[in-house]
């Protein structure tokens, strides 16, 4: 009988030890996952001089992961990340608007919400002009206005959309 008792204690300790190892591994990987990726935290990014920014389209700037445009004399630095699920939102030259390929959200040239499942307009970056160059700070994000907020620019679509508006 004492042999069964020893075996029972051994198995109980083995299970406890095994569960402890699994819990430790889960905690370790979760902690590792929550740490910021080196070099991904954002910061100032030198781009182009203001006279190179289009007034009727957008300029894609991969280094800042976004776009620059000029609207009524004001520069806008727009993050290309969709606020719905984080997809990269490309500019559609034919329609003159941003169109998310993941779920069909559409934004005007200023990144303001037009339609789709996104909860708000596209986020923007704060920026300064240093030595004649636009320098967005990708660590300083300005949250887009909530869906349903009236657009501040009057630019209807120029033509056909790049994505099928009935898809999604």
Language-model segments: residues:
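N-terminal pre-ligand scaffold of iron-sulfur
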Residues: 3, 9-95, 125-168
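Membrane-embedded segments
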Residues: 81, 88-112, 121
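Interfacial helix-loop-helix junctions of multi-pass membrane proteins
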Residues: 117-118
């Amino acid at each position: 009988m004492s042999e069964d008792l020893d075996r029972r204690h051994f198995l109980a300790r083995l299970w406890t030890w095994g569960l402890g190892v699994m819990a430790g591994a889960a905690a370790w990987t979760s902690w590792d996952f929550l740490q910021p990726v080196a070099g991904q935290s954002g910061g100032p990014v030198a781009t182009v001089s203001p006279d190179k920014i289009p007034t009727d389209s957008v300029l894609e700037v991969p280094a800042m992961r976004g776009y620059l445009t000029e609207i009524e004399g004001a520069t806008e630095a727009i993050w290309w990340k969709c606020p719905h699920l984080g997809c990269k939102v490309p500019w559609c030259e034919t329609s003159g608007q941003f169109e998310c390929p993941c779920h069909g959200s559409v934004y005007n040239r200023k990144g303001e919400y037009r339609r789709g499942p996104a909860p708000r307009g596209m986020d923007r970056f704060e920026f300064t002009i240093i030595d004649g160059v636009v320098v967005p700070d990708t660590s300083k994000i300005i949250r887009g206005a909530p869906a349903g907020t009236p657009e501040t620019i009057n630019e209807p679509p120029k033509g056909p959309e790049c994505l099928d508006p009935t898809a999604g």
